[in-house]
Amino acid sequence: MSETFIYPQANLIAGVDEVGRGPLVGAVVTAAVILDPNRPIVGLADSKKLSEKRRLSLYDEITEKALSWSLGRAEPEEIDQLNILHATMLAMQRAVSGLHIVPDYVLIDGNRCPKLQMPSLAVVKGDSRVAEISAASILAKVTRDREMTELDLLFPEYGFAQHKGYPTAFHLEKLAALGATVHHRRSFGPVKRVLGLV
């Protein structure tokens, strides 16, 4: 079990997380959430450890009960232009700036913080230690998974609904056989190779 997180002294704390750094296709999606202490949400946890059904149920509860929540993203073209780390930081900045209530402290999952206008702290394994980050991870994952399901309708042969764009054996096989879609990240090794850019 990860060690207990000691919260900073602040009134309005936002949690931020991202989903989709590893996939070969689609945007990296981020979320920022300020929870309402008067409307607790039971069962918040790292989105990867929850069933899809539980994530969907918590998604609805978070969007209904949170004081403020916002999504951010960086598109494949931005990822290719900036690199995945900088694109993720940009998407996190977008999520925070989209909050309709300005937080006075921001907790970010991972070991790096984007440049923000308020104090922030990176929390390793934050998605399982900080409720606000857990909530953000759920919003980001449900949103990105839905986008992959929609992409699957446009390109059913790639199996995006199953692997969510991650480089599974099936995805790599289809990429080699069919080539890249306009939604693939051209700077990622397997896509580069298929496009002959290596």
Curated annotation (Swiss-Prot):
Entry's Gene Ontology molecular function annotations: manganese ion binding; RNA binding; RNA-DNA hybrid ribonuclease activity
Catalytic activity, reaction form: Endonucleolytic cleavage to 5'-phosphomonoester
Record-linked Pfam families: RNase_HII (PF01351)
GO cellular component, one term: cytoplasm
Keywords of this entry: Cytoplasm, Endonuclease, Hydrolase, Manganese, Metal-binding, Nuclease
Disulphide bonds in the chain: none
Top EC group: hydrolase
Family of the protein in this entry: Belongs to the RNase HII family.
Primary role: Endonuclease that specifically degrades the RNA of RNA-DNA hybrids.
Name of the molecule in the record: Ribonuclease HII
Natural source organism: Yersinia pestis
Taxonomic path: Bacteria, Pseudomonadati, Pseudomonadota, Gammaproteobacteria, Enterobacterales
Gene behind this protein: rnhB
